[in-house]
């Protein structure tokens, strides 16, 4: 198929491919301008839009070069939001970042962006919320259920047992 351009210039499928790339680029910059994305998220969105692996690689490189994608910035935002707003622990956050293919160095760098006070506050919020809904016959049973629930939310087992006070368990 031949496309006709103004001034009598003709061009083959490479012109259509160029327009497609530019349209995909504009779509991805619009998405990245609204919130943080990692490379894996953008690659998945491009795959769903029908982009080839080569096009995906070129577009992701361009987005990184122009500052639309920054894995370190993404990791910091992810850690902040998941701990403070979703009540996740460090273990679960790190696991999800690894699953998205974020570099371990960025994960390590992002973890300290949450202070110990903020982390303790998030832990206590989840603890209070869960203790209202967990039922058991004995204090021991309630504490075990509570501990399992907190560990499943991604809080470190040692942190859970060190910071879970009997004062929070009501009969």
Predicted features and spans:
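An alpha-helical, amphipathic repeat domain used for nucleic-acid recognition
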Residues: 3-171
